[in-house]
Amino acid sequence: MNDLLDKKCVPCEGGVMPFDISEIHKYQKKVDGWEITKNKEEIFFLSKKFKFENFLKSQDFVNEVGKVSEKEGHHPDISFGWGYAEIKVTTHAINGLSENDFILAAKIDKIISV
């Protein structure tokens, strides 16, 4: 079982360094299908696109992601439409990835497996 599912996101208000590339790759192995991307400011994100049968199933998934995100106190960027939802996660306070991002990714994946 993924040990990230047993963890809780810890509030981050800065003052810590974002993961370096070796830490990112170590944690990426724990979240299947999540890609490492960078935005134009060179900030790392985790991203994943989920596919669904229709708009309503996409919306239901996004609503469940919202519930998990609120519970964890860590909020992704979400876009969705007919048959898809795309999730992007980063720790804005440190301009990069932290363990919180991988915890949230694992918990989002669990929504799909239920």
Regions found by a protein language model. Name each.
Residues 1-56, 60-114:
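Long, contiguous binding/interaction regions
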